């Protein structure tokens, strides 16, 4: 179908988002066309602001508009415990359950030789620095329960064990092959309380 250039450009832009195919992108583009101009300008500004105003915390790697992030700055949290997750979305999922009160470390990925992602491509070096510089007693490996997540957890556990820090893994109540961000609060809560030492 031939659309005017601005609509085609908007459809192509929407299709860059995950899970958005041509039909959905077309529906969204025409919805934008029907929106009030102020709403469209606000929407466009929100998109630009996300890229311009957010960064990654220099301590833990979580998304933030301040550095360090609000979690790293919160001295009421348990400073002796770090929960390692693959993505910032996983921090948000963990925080929703309101049970875990420690710190986080975001890897921004998982080891995946098939995709050419090795340990040096994820946020492991800064984790090791934190473990040396901070008084951490327990490291909770909350990577996804799939091949990449398990490989990443085992790799980190092998690096950390000689340091003498307790290394635990979330209890399996999480489905194998699933992503942490899609788990409900009850499942996550049971997984964190039933974590096992590696």
Curated annotation (Swiss-Prot):
Keyword Metal-binding belongs to the record: yes
Protein's GO biological process: DNA recombination; DNA repair
Disulfide bonds: none
PROSITE patterns: RECR, TOPRIM
Top-level taxon: Bacteria
Keyword annotations from UniProtKB, A to Z: DNA damage, DNA recombination, DNA repair, Metal-binding, Zinc, Zinc-finger
An MF annotation (GO) of this entry: DNA binding
Zn finger spans (C4-type): 57-72
Pfam families per UniProt: RecR_C, RecR_HhH, RecR_ZnF, Toprim_4
Domain Toprim: 80-175
NCBIfam families (UniProt xref): recR
Described function: May play a role in DNA repair. It seems to be involved in an RecBC-independent recombinational process of DNA repair. It may act with RecF and RecO.
Family affiliation: Belongs to the RecR family.
Protein name (record): Recombination protein RecR
Organism name: Macrococcus caseolyticus (strain JCSC5402)
Gene: recR
């Amino acid at each position: 179908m031939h659309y005017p250039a601005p609509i085609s450009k908007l459809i192509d832009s929407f299709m860059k988002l995950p899970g958005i195919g041509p039909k959905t992108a077309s529906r969204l583009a025409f919805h934008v066309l029907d929106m009030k101009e102020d709403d469209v300008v606000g929407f466009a500004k929100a998109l630009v602001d996300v890229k311009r105003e957010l960064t990654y915390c220099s301590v833990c790697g979580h998304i933030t508009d301040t550095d360090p992030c609000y979690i790293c700055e919160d001295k009421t949290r348990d400073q002796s415990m770090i929960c390692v997750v693959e993505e910032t979305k996983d921090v948000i999922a963990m925080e929703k359950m309101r049970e875990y009160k420690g710190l986080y470390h975001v890897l921004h990925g998982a080891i995946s030789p098939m995709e050419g992602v090795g340990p040096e491509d994820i946020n492991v070096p800064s984790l090791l620095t934190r473990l040396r510089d901070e008084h951490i007693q327990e490291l909770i490996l909350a990577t996804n329960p799939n091949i990449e997540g398990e490989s990443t957890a085992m790799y980190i556990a092998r690096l950390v064990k000689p340091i003498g820090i307790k290394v635990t893994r979330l209890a399996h109540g999480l489905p194998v092959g699933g992503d942490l961000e899609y788990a409900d609060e009850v499942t996550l809560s049971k997984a964190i309380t039933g974590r096992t030492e590696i």
